[in-house]
């Protein structure tokens, strides 16, 4: 049975329109926010995958499109099992990988709902692509810890280039599903700051982070360029120029930390001082040059760590709880 969630039926509408005009995506819907209409803030990749599957199976009528695309969340759920196994094995060994794979196959709550047959929503694709991104990003970091990476030695970059590219492609795919997956860029930015600081106090090189963050940034910006700018609102949660600017800041921020680490070699507190001064300076410059970007950033943080009254009806934006997990 198909769920009654209006988002699911809206996805069916987008998929049906895409099947008829493949691969054209319906970026503006006159019937949403009637009578003005509305620019669609959801990405095109999930409907593209579903509509391509419909066309390949010969499902072009409405009922057939619904029947075929209803299985797309299940397919993503199946693909998550090996991804979670490898992620668990990478972090804590093969036994942890098996346990994680078993749990991801039987866990209930929000995850089960998002990967259930008939719940045709983009969240299953968000989960899959961001998990693949985490898998290869962590794998790249693990490889860098086993083989010293130096920017002055191009041959030392070989072990991390391929996993960095795969991580970049996965993140690019996630951004093409939904711009709010930009959240993972914020996680990467926080990790990068912590890792650079840790390595500064322990006398270790952090060249590999410049490489992997650079590759991820290039692929993410390329993905956003292919998708294009379709929102008149400058916001990190829409397909405006804001997500592209934020991804560029991730790379330039990493490059700035790399410069600070090179200038303050064996002087960790100098690195900390330069980082704090640099952060204050960057925020001040951004506030002067593009106050809209700064406001959008603070709004995104407020939405993530708090909850605005207008977001209350949105299930996926509610604070997580043990009840939702299980």
Language-model regions, residue ranges each:
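Active-site lumenal/periplasmic loops and adjacent helix-entry segments of GT-C-fold
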Residues: 1-91, 95-103, 107-131, 149
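Residue-level recognition of short, well-ordered coil/turn positions
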Residues: 22-23, 145, 201-202
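Membrane-embedded helix bundles of polyisoprenyl
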Residues: 72-90, 95-197, 212-230
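Transmembrane catalytic cores of multi-pass membrane glycosyltransferases
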Residues: 126, 163-166, 170-326
